[in-house]
């Protein structure tokens, strides 16, 4: 795949009502036209809140909108037939499809069980109370509406290591379940935040139970056969032992008919933690570049006071570009969400130019930046806020520019705190470009491109600058950009 470009084609507040799968089928041609060649679908299986579930409250991995469970047959995004039709339309347009894998926890159990638990200090999960409490917990998953179709596996308390609510006595908190697998405490090879960040929410899946790991491998084989997907996005891997995903990825790559694209979400702004995880899984997955996303957030808030020469310092794409999926926003960082770190709209064209037109990393585009989003929700202060996420003008042109002009050797001109630039040399087959941007006043860069680019007329593909720039016989010229803007200069004859 030339210049892979990923679209996250949903957001947290995408409307319910089964609209997404039909929308994707309808938009598939348009994705192809602008240069999107890979899409990340939201969790396609039934969540605990049924037709209202975003998908991260995972209930039944085998219900792709086919069974009357949790008050609905379709998921929030549509039914199984609509899902498969959307995937078919995307594939007809040579667009690879990634499925979202949420196997850290389950929610919405069908039955209670008598269980034994120990209280856990929420601020230091390594502190586990010695007292064992006899109680009941919602830990048994039988999926009665599915009635054993596709899988007869029954989840019970032996499949989980933790829970956040018990009954008889009724109590909320974090509790470690006592069973045959949890004697040593939490799983290892997870993030060390809060002492041990194995537990996140719901019924925490325990990967030390061999039957559980085999069931999740079986599900992967099943869902690949059902959907013919081309890869996976792995949710919340900082809470899942790295050894499990190394093993799981090895398995799915072995049984897949072709190599799968796999990217994991390890949300940490410490690049060392991301590199440690990559080492633990022996480089078998890419990771989203959370440090870079935070840099974009900070730069957009600071304006001209942000030193653009440092925009990639301490990021994964700088440290390990071959394992970095770069992004400007996602469903967790959008306003009013758990990891809220929005990038101001004025800066988004600059940020997208930096991930789409450079050679490093695989860029991910966020659905609302292409199509807009309007919603309201309650903030941390209890107040309700209306949110308007505008369409980012020229984003479709930047994506197209990636396919047409982001080729060849890259040279950086990061020599001014406000105005930076980079060039792509082009190849024998595809032309290159010069990208200039400023977070302050109007900017300019004098760039020597070499004799092969002598006496050429250049224009701004985005149309932000109206003048033409002509290189001298040695291929040197001064290229411009507006203040708080970006320009993509290309040879006029190739537009």
UniProtKB/Swiss-Prot annotation:
It comes from the Bacteria. The active site is at 235 (nucleophile), 265 (proton donor). Pfam families: Alpha-amylase. It comes from Escherichia coli (strain K12). It is found in: Cytoplasm. The record marks 332 as: Transition state stabilizer. Its main location: cytoplasm. GO terms for cellular component: cytoplasm. The lineage of its organism: Bacteria, Pseudomonadati, Pseudomonadota, Gammaproteobacteria, Enterobacterales. Its EC number is 3.2.1.1. Ca(2+) binds at residues 104, 198, 239. Belongs to the glycosyl hydrolase 13 family. InterPro entries: A-amylase_thermo (IPR013776), Glyco_hydro_13_cat_dom (IPR006047), Glyco_hydro_b (IPR013780), Glycoside_hydrolase_SF (IPR017853). Signal peptide: none annotated. This is Cytoplasmic alpha-amylase. Monomer. It catalyses: Endohydrolysis of (1->4)-alpha-D-glucosidic linkages in polysaccharides containing three or more (1->4)-alpha-linked D-glucose units. Keywords: Calcium, Carbohydrate metabolism, Cytoplasm, Glycosidase, Hydrolase, Metal-binding, Sodium. Its cofactor is Ca(2+). Binds 1 Ca(2+) ion per subunit. One of its GO terms (molecular function) is calcium ion binding. GO terms for biological process: carbohydrate metabolic process.
């Amino acid at each position: 795949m030339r210049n892979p470009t990923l679209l996250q084609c949903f957001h947290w507040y995408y409307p319910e009502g089964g609209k997404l799968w039909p929308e994707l089928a309808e938009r598939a041609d348009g994705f192809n036209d602008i240069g999107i060649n890979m899409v990340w679908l939201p969790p396609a299986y039934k969540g605990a809140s049924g037709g209202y579930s975003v998908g991260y409250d995972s209930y039944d991995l085998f219900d792709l909108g086919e069974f009357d469970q949790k008050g609905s047959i379709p998921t929030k995004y549509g039914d199984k037939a609509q899902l498969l039709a959307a995937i078919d339309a995307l594939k007809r347009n040579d667009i690879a499809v990634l499925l979202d894998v949420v196997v850290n926890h389950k929610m919405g159990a069908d039955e209670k069980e008598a269980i034994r638990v120990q209280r856990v200090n929420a601020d230091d999960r390594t502190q586990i109370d010695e007292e064992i409490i006899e109680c009941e917990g919602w830990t048994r998953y039988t999926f009665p509406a599915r009635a054993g179709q596709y899988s007869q596996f029954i989840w019970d308390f032996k499949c989980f290591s933790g829970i956040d609510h018990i009954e008889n006595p009724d109590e909320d908190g974090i509790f470690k379940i006592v069973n045959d697998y949890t004697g040593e405490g939490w799983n290892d090879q997870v993030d060390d935040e809060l002492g041990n960040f194995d537990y996140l929410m719901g019924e925490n899946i325990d990967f030390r139970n061999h039957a559980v790991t085999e069931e999740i491998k079986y599900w992967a084989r099943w869902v690949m056969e059902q959907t013919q997907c081309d890869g996976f996005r792995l949710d919340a891997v900082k809470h899942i032992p790295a050894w499990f995903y190394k093993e799981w990825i090895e398995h799915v790559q072995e049984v897949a008919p072709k190599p799968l694209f796999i990217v994991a979400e390890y949300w940490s702004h410490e690049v060392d933690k991301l590199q440690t995880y990559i080492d633990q899984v022996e480089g078998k997955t890419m990771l989203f570049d959370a440090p870079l996303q935070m840099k974009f957030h900070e730069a957009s808030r600071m304006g001209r006071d942000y030193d653009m020469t440092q925009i990639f310092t301490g990021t994964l794409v700088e440290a390990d570009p071959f394992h970095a999926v770069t992004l400007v926003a996602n469903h967790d960082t959008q306003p009013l969400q758990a990891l809220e770190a929005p990038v101001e709209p004025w800066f988004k064209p600059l940020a997208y130019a930096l991930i789409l037109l450079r050679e490093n990393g695989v860029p991910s585009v966020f659905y609302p930046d292409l199509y807009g989003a309007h919603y309201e929700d309650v903030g941390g202060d209890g107040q309700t806020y209306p949110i308007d996420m505008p369409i980012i003008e020229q984003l479709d042109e930047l994506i197209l520019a990636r396919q047409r002009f982001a080729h060849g050797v890259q040279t950086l001109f990061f020599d001014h705190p406000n105005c930076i630039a980079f060039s792509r040399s082009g190849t024998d087959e595809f032309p290159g470009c010069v990208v200039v941007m400023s977070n302050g006043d109007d900017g300019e860069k004098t760039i020597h491109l070499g004799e092969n680019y002598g006496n050429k007329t250049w224009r701004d593909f985005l149309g932000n600058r109206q003048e033409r720039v002509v290189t001298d016989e040695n291929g040197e010229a001064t290229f411009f950009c507006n203040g708080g803007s970006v320009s993509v200069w290309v040879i006029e004859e190739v537009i």
